[in-house]
Amino acid sequence: MATLVQTGKAKQLTLLGFFAITASMVMAVYEYPTFATSGFSLVFFLLLGGILWFIPVGLCAAEMATVDGWEEGGVFAWVSNTLGPRWGFAAISFGYLQIAIGFIPMLYFVLGALSYILKWPALNEDPITKTIAALIILWALALTQFGGTKYTARIAKVGFFAGILLPAFILIALAAIYLHSGAPVAIEMDSKTFFPDFSKVGTLVVFVAFILSYMGVEASATHVNEMSNPGRDYPLAMLLLMVAAICLSSVGGLSIAMVIPGNEINLSAGVMQTFTVLMSHVAPEIEWTVRVISALLLLGVLAEIASWIVGPSRGMYVTAQKNLLPAAFAKMNKNGVPVTLVISQLVITSIALIILTNTGGGNNMSFLIALALTVVIYLCAYFMLFIGYIVLVLKHPDLKRTFNIPGGKGVKLVVAIVGLLTSIMAFIVSFLPPDNIQGDSTDMYVELLVVSFLVVLALPFILYAVHDRKGKANTGVTLEPINSQNAPKGHFFLHPRARSPHYIVMNDKKH
């Protein structure tokens, strides 16, 4: 039967060291156009999400990750130990399923970049063309990963620097030159526009995109066990991450909002739209470089998608190891890839992609539904995380843990309740149609989102109810937790949501 090897961890991770291995989550270039649709109030939304949601998630997850015996297994272990195995299975399943849907807006971004490079608008506008191209890209990337993940982290590292970091800094630099030149700005930036118009509920829907940009921090919480002084350094690391996310996302989103009017922003190709306008203003003689930058962005997001294909399935593998999934899901190929889990996830992505692209028109509505669906699925896992933490505080205060939220029981409960209420607010708002979706499309938006969500919501509970868990999945596989000392090169350039939490050891070979 598969086993989990406990590994000793040197307590030598500093504040800056923890920040460095988590910082990849603050770069979300493909979300900048969505941020930009809220104008200057995007800064308000980033602050709101950071203070009321990101910090509570990080603090609650860190305390749960340092409870004796809970150090490995992530949200599955935390929720299982507080709410029971059914809910633990559901929580990790929602993390697995949100990745399946989260691939869709990333693929839309890829197609937006390709349409600019190839000068082929149908690739970003025609639903059938868009569907076929996205499916080809998705499964082609998957095939590259079935051969093993030996080079995945290195590819992610190159993609992060060349395809995400470099274009982001070029975007910001061009926007600064544009602003300094006195060119017209598409938004007003003052105290009045800092706050969104709360009388228009549709303007608040964009908040889900900001919550999505903060999601995944709980995946790095296990590394708190490696910190030399977690009580002092971890809260500071969370603040640094929040400040970095707010600064980078604000500047990136505003770079687009200043140049492209909100009602003209294409959510899939908005970054390329902006580069075109900026380059034609700053250096029209080298406007051809927009296609080069688009190619860099394309490669960056392709590398990101490729690196996300196997990691979450390896995380889900722990449930197959505990026989919470049928034995077929515990099967590995010779390269240490849980093929059944990976293929199942990609089938879900493909079905959702076909439905959303062709019923949503393949335009901004498809992008927004995919984004909102990703968020509401993932929020279900966070509901359980916060409720599990409240149970831990109220019923198990005696359990030893390395990190405690400072301030005692009252502060702990306030932090968890604030995070839970913010999650509930984001969940409700997600089902409201945005302002840029009008007429009959609003009904279609809500219907597609609600039906899709209910189907995904039911999957883990149906599977748990019908599967006979009496047998044992005999896989001959050992799981070795990954930490800051034994991680493969480039591992920490992956977004925390996409990282495999452990090595797969088969026949004395580590994958």
Curated annotation (Swiss-Prot):
Any single Gene Ontology cellular-component annotation: plasma membrane
Notes on activation and inhibition: Shows pH-dependent activity. The glutamate analog L-trans-pyrrolidine-2,4-dicarboxylic acid (L-PDC) blocks the uptake of glutamate by selective inhibition.
Residues exposed to the Cytoplasmic side: 1-14, 63-93, 149-157, 222-239, 313-335, 388-412, 467-511
Residue numbers on the Periplasmic membrane side: 36-41, 115-127, 179-200, 261-291, 357-366, 434-445
Subcellular localization, as worded in the UniProt entry: Cell inner membrane
BP terms from Gene Ontology: amino acid transport
Cited InterPro entries: AA/rel_permease1 (IPR002293), APC_superfamily (IPR050367), Glu_antiport (IPR004759)
UniProt topology in membrane: Multi-pass membrane protein
Keywords: Amino-acid transport, Antiport, Cell inner membrane, Cell membrane, Membrane, Transmembrane, Transmembrane helix, Transport, Virulence
Principal cellular location given in the protein's record: membrane
Catalyzed reactions: 4-aminobutanoate(in) + L-glutamate(out) = 4-aminobutanoate(out) + L-glutamate(in)
Annotated Gene3D superfamilies: Amino acid/polyamine transporter I
Transmembrane residue ranges: 15-35, 42-62, 94-114, 128-148, 158-178, 201-221, 240-260, 292-312, 336-356, 367-387, 413-433, 446-466
Recorded family membership: Belongs to the amino acid-polyamine-organocation (APC) superfamily. Glutamate:GABA antiporter (GGA) (TC 2.A.3.7) family.
Record's function text: Involved in glutaminase-dependent acid resistance. Exchanges extracellular glutamate (Glu) for intracellular gamma-aminobutyric acid (GABA) under acidic conditions. The ability to survive the extremely acidic conditions of the stomach is essential for successful colonization of the host by commensal and pathogenic bacteria.
Protein's name in the database: Glutamate/gamma-aminobutyrate antiporter
Protein species of origin: Escherichia coli O157:H7
